[in-house]
């Protein structure tokens, strides 16, 4: 029960958290000291550090927009497991350049079932510690383009089962092909990705 080795925080310490707004059905990722200052129509969700479904998963079919605030670039999530899985009405994700993935180990089901997303800019994604990408882009029916940089690597990935399966609109260096849906195609030179440019400051 102290601020140095215990569970308490110093006043003014920043927290990483997510706010679901039930009026505009938006999901906003924040990193600041205002975790207790939310409106009546907003719900604060904590960010899991392991492979557990996120709190906002219960609202997945309602979410239409995701926003990462610039301050979130200072957060260091350990897992993106199920973050946007089966958000079937999600049409836009803003500020993905502010998601620092350098400490993330699991991206399983991260975008699976996002049926309305057409483009993902993952150019700043550092996947050097990721070991699990199962179903990461599974059944993204409208997804045509995924932008990445050379920081998107799969060297440590041991579970890539059905990573791209049924995302048949994908086209990068090659177009999607049935039975070709593992990490082999997670690159922009010979796979389904397109080369992009990282625009965020670490």
Question: What does each of the following model-derived ranges do?
Answer:
Residues 1-23, 34, 165-202:
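Extracellular/surface-exposed low-complexity segments
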Residues 12-69, 83, 90, 198-202:
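N-terminal segments that cap or nucleate solenoid repeat domains
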Residues 53-55, 136, 161-173:
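Small/polar residue-rich beta-strand/coil "junction" motifs that cap repeat-based extracellular fibers
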Residues 78-85:
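Non-membrane alpha-helical segments in proteins
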Residues 85-86, 109-113, 135-139, 165:
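Short beta-strand elements of solenoid repeat domains
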């Amino acid at each position: 029960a102290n601020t140095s080795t215990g569970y308490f925080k110093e006043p003014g310490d920043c927290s990483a958290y997510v706010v679901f707004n039930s009026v505009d059905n938006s999901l906003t990722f924040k990193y600041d000291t205002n975790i207790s200052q939310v409106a009546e129509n907003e719900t604060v969700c904590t960010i899991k550090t392991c492979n557990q479904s996120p709190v906002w998963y219960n609202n997945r079919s309602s979410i239409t927009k995701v926003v990462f605030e610039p301050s979130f670039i200072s957060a260091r999530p350990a897992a993106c497991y199920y973050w946007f899985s089966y958000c079937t009405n999600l049409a836009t994700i803003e500020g993905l350049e502010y998601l620092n993935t350098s400490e993330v180990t699991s991206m399983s089901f991260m975008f699976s079932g996002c049926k309305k997303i057409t483009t993902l800019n993952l150019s700043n994604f550092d996947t050097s510690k990721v070991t699990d990408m199962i179903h990461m882009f599974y059944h993204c029916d409208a997804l045509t383009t995924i932008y990445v940089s050379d920081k998107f690597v799969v060297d440590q990935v041991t579970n890539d089962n059905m990573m791209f399966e049924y995302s048949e609109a994908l086209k990068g260096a090659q177009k999607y092909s049935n039975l070709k849906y593992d990490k082999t195609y997670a690159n922009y030179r010979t796979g389904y990705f397109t080369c992009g440019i990282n625009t965020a400051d670490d």
